[in-house]
């Protein structure tokens, strides 16, 4: 049986810069930090995590996702999200945890583990957003949308993308 948001407890974690991040915790046992993908929330990892596995799932909602504050949008990066996850793990004071993620969460988990290996008892990567390339072709629409949003209001950026040749390919 999978963990569910209805049985998980919710707590707030406050980052070094004062943002409130939502964390949903389910299960009992050793800590497993499980991170969601882009535009996801705690439901994504909790649905995948078995209830009776002997682990305690910590589903940290990244900045701007789920119940978490967004903060300065210029600070949204895999580096910053990994720093948030690192600080959260350290706040648990329970030693090394298994760290995992889905898609964007996998990228965050990989960065956290690469820079702070002593915090990782294991690493689980599900559907990583990228593996061996810093900017694979399948993420080109995301880059285009980000550029358009950086230069135009959201409505104009949306229209521009919808009318683009790239949008017609997806």
Put a short name on every predicted segment.
Residues 135-139, 150-170:
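Conserved alpha/beta-hydrolase catalytic His-Asp/Glu region
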Residues 36, 97, 101-106:
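Conserved alpha/beta-hydrolase "nucleophile elbow" surrounding the catalytic nucleophile
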Residues 58-98:
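Active-site loop/oxyanion-hole signature of alpha/beta-hydrolase fold enzymes
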């Amino acid at each position: 049986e999978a963990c569910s948001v209805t049985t998980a407890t919710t707590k707030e974690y406050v980052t070094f810069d004062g943002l409130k991040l939502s964390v949903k915790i389910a299960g009992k046992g050793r800590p497993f930090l499980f991170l969601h993908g882009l535009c996801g929330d705690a439901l994504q990892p909790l649905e995948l995590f078995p209830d009776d596995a002997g682990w305690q799932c910590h589903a940290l909602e990244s900045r701007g996702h789920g119940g978490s504050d967004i903060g300065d949008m210029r600070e949204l990066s895999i580096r910053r999200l990994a720093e948030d996850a690192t600080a959260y793990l350290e706040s648990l004071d329970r030693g090394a945890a298994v760290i995992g993620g889905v898609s964007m969460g996998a990228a965050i988990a990989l960065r956290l583990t690469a820079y702070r290996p002593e915090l990782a008892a294991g690493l689980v990567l599900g559907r990583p957003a990228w593996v061996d390339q810093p900017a694979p072709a399948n993420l080109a629409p995301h880059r285009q949308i980000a550029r358009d949003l950086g230069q135009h209001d959201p409505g104009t950026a949306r229209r521009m993308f919808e009318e683009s040749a790239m949008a017609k390919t997806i």
